[in-house]
A protein has these predicted regions:
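ABC-type nucleotide-binding domain
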Residues: 1, 344-347
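Membrane-proximal cytosolic tails and large cytosolic loops of membrane proteins
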Residues: 1-22, 88-98, 107-126, 197-206, ...
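Membrane-integrated ABC transporters
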Residues: 1-45, 66-71, 90, 123-162, ...
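An intracellular "coupling" helix at the cytosolic face of ABC transporter transmembrane type-1 domains
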Residues: 25, 29, 134-147, 199-206, ...
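Transmembrane helix-loop-helix hairpins at lipid-water interfaces of multipass membrane proteins
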Residues: 32-89, 165-197, 271-278, 282-292
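Juxtamembrane helix-loop junctions of ABC transporter transmembrane domains
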Residues: 49, 53, 82-122, 193-197, ...
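Cytosolic ends of transmembrane helices, especially the final helix of ABC transmembrane type-1 domains
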Residues: 232, 276, 295-333
C-alpha cells in the first residue's frame, strides 16, 4: 500500500520569520543579533586566513618593501585575531538567550494544553501532535533552540561562499557553470531525501508513545502489586522488546535513506573538485596567473567546495528543523471548535 505523504504547512522562510517573532515576544531580540555577528566573525576568520599567505607572496612578487609586507601581515593577522576572539566569545555567551526563547515556546505549549476544549483534548490526532510538539522543545538539541545555531552556521557558509565565488570569477565561466549545475543537482536531490523523516513522523511518534506507555506502566507503584501477583513482568518485557525492535527497524530504514544523501554528496563533490582543479591548472600552465594569484585561487577552490558543501548541509539541516517547527506551529494554531471568549455572561 502506498504511504500517504503530508506536505508541510509552512516553508523555511515563514518559519524563520516566526522564530524572529518568538524571540521578540520573549524579549530576546539579541538572539538573532548574536547569530549574525558570529556568522560575520567566523566568515572573517576563514577569509582573512585564506588571504594571508597569497597576499604575502604577491607582495614579494611585486618587489614590495619590508614595511609593506609587515603592514600586510599585521592587518590580516589583526583581522584574524579579532574575528577569532569574537567567535570564541559568542560560542557560549548567547546560550541562555536561546534557552529563554525555547522555554517561552514550552510555556505556550503548556498553556495551549491547559485551555484547549475537551473535544480537542480527547482527539487522538491532537494528542499525537501535542506529543510531537513537546518532543521538539525538550532539550538544547531540538529545533526550537538549535535552529539559531544552524542558522548562524548557514549564514557563515553563505557569506564565505559569496566571497570565494567572487575570487573565482577570473578563472573560467565553464568552471562556474559546472559548479552551479552540480550544486543545483545536489540541492534538489537532498531536499527530497531529507523530507523522509517528516513524511513518516506519525509512524515514529506512535512507536515512541507505545514504548513510553509500557515503560511508565512497568514503573508504576500503583500497578506494581498486580504486576508481581499475576506475573506480568515477562509479558511487559516482551511487549517493550517487540516495540523496540520495530523502532530499530524504523531507524534502520531512515538511515538507509539518509545514507544515499552522503553518497550523492561524495560523488558530486568529487566531480566538482576535479573540474575545478582541471580548469585552474590549465589556466595556470597557459601563463594566465602569477604565483600569488595561483596560490589564492588554489586555496579558494578548496574553500569554495567546503563552503558550498556547508551551505547545502546547513540548508538541509534547517529544512529538517523547519519541519519540526511546523509541528509546534500546527499545535499552537489548532482552531478551537468553540468560541472561548467574547460571549455574554450567564444571568
Amino acid at each position: 500500500m502506498k504511504e500517504k505523504t503530508k506536505k508541510p504547512r509552512y516553508n523555511l522562510g515563514q518559519n524563520m520569520l516566526w522564530m524572529l517573532r518568538q524571540a521578540h515576544a520573549a524579549h530576546r531580540d539579541d538572539v538573532p543579533v548574536f547569530a549574525v555577528i558570529k556568522a560575520l566573525a567566523m566568515a572573517g576568520t576563514g577569509i582573512s586566513g585564506l588571504l594571508l599567505a597569497p597576499e604575502i607572496v604577491r607582495c614579494v612578487e611585486d618587489g614590495a618593501g619590508f614595511s609593506r609586507i609587515l603592514a600586510t601581515i599585521a592587518v590580516l593577522a589583526g583581522v584574524l585575531l579579532v574575528c577569532s576572539a569574537v567567535s570564541a566569545y559568542l560560542e557560549h555567551a548567547p546560550m541562555f538567550a536561546r534557552v529563554d526563547v525555547r522555554l517561552a515556546l514550552v510555556r505556550k505549549i503548556h498553556y495551549k494544553t491547559c485551555v484547549m476544549s475537551y473535544p480537542l483534548s480527547e482527539d487522538p490526532e491532537v494528542l499525537k501532535l501535542q506529543e510531537q510538539a513537546v518532543r521538539a522543545t525538550m532539550n538544547n538539541r531540538c529545533a526550537s533552540e538549535a535552529f539559531w545555531v544552524d542558522e548562524q552556521k548557514f549564514l557563515t557558509a553563505a557569506l564565505s561562499f559569496v566571497v570565494y565565488l567572487l575570487l573565482l570569477t577570473n578563472t573560467s565561466a565553464w568552471l562556474l557553470a559546472a559548479l552551479t549545475v552540480t550544486t543545483a543537482a545536489e540541492y534538489f536531490v537532498n531536499r527530497r531525501i531529507n523530507e523522509w523523516g517528516y513524511r513518516h513522523r506519525d509512524e515514529a511518534a506512535a512507536l515512541e508513545k507505545k514504548m513510553d506507555y509500557v515503560s511508565d506502566k512497568a514503573q508504576s507503584t500503583v500497578l506494581g502489586k498486580d504486576i508481581r501477583i499475576f506475573g506480568m513482568r515477562p509479558w511487559l518485557e516482551a511487549v517493550y522488546d517487540k516495540t523496540l525492535r520495530a523502532f530499530d527497524a524504523f531507524v534502520e530504514r531512515r538511515e538507509r535513506v539518509y545514507f544515499w544523501t552522503n553518497v550523492i554528496d561524495a560523488a558530486l563533490t568529487a566531480v566538482r573538485n576535479g573540474l575545478a582543479y582541471y580548469f585552474l591548472l590549465r589556466q595556470t600552465l597557459a601563463g594566465g596567473m602569477g604565483a600569488g594569484d595561483f596560490l589564492l585561487c588554489f586555496s579558494a577552490v578548496g574553500a569554495y567546495a567546503e563552503q558550498l558543501n556547508g551551505v547545502l548541509a546547513e540548508l538541509g539541516t534547517l529544512r529538517r528543523q523547519s519541519l519540526d517547527l511546523c509541528v509546534i506551529r500546527e499545535y499552537l494554531e489548532l482552531p478551537e471548535p468553540f468560541r472561548m471568549e467574547g460571549g455574554k455572561p450567564l444571568p
